[in-house]
A protein has these predicted regions:
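Catalytic Walker B motif of ABC-type/P-loop ATPase nucleotide-binding domains
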Residues: 156-160
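Helix-to-loop junction immediately C-terminal to a conserved catalytic motif
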Residues: 52
């Protein structure tokens, strides 16, 4: 029997003058890489904001790791999830290491000793002492993914991770996602409006 890390059932999000999501039903198998593709404004970011608990649905429901969104246990389930929503939440005046230390402090994890390992994992091993304001867009995306990995998640959610990247940057992010899935068994949900780049 297939085990799903995320299931949505007729999930809906209405705003005053429009619907961002209208009855979305989807199932993401544990251990998969799942591409969520649609044009800009199709509701991809809205879905991600809902499952991250940043907004409440107008209708329908979802389960995360088998727990319904209406169950109080959903809060602890979200701790098994790492996300980069819209753009990475990073501090430009801090170094890469300081950004990761800050996230470890927020999550109350004892992950300080794993910071160099995380930076190495995302291809930023030699940049830990550099201020983020000097990073390229691709480096910022990779640091955002490292921060999302700080809590050792089972489920990684990436909102438009290749947006604005050059061809080499797209290749690097795609290879990183495959590596995380194969070597760490992390389930990945990727939203993108570029079907061709996502599916290669």
């Amino acid at each position: 029997m297939t085990e799903y890390i995320l299931e949505t059932n007729a999930l809906t999000k209405h705003y005053r003058k429009f619907s961002a999501l209208n009855g979305l039903t989807m199932h993401i198998p544990k251990g998969s890489i799942y591409g969520f593709v649609g044009r800009n404004g199709a509701g991809k970011t809205t879905l991600i904001r809902l499952i991250c608990g940043l907004q409440e649905p107008s209708g329908g429901e979802y389960t995360l790791c088998g727990v319904k969104n209406t169950d109080k246990k959903i809060i602890s389930c979200r701790r098994k999830m790492g996300a980069v929503v819209e753009s990475p939440a990073i501090y430009s005046e801090m170094t890469a290491e300081e950004n990761l230390k800050q996230q470890s402090h927020i999550l109350r994890t004892s992950g300080v000793e794993n910071i160099s390992e995380l930076l190495e994992l995302v291809g930023l091993g030699d940049t830990g002492k550099k201020k983020v304001k000097n990073f390229s867009l691709g480096m910022r995306q990779r640091l955002g993914i490292a921060i999302a990995l700080a809590g050792n998640p089972q489920f990684l959610v990436l909102d438009e991770p290749i947006n604005g990247l050059d061809p080499q940057g797209i290749i690097e992010i795609r290879e990183l996602i495959l590596k995380l899935n194969r070597e760490r068994g992390i389930t990945v949900l990727i939203s993108s409006h570029i079907l061709d780049e996502l599916s290669r």
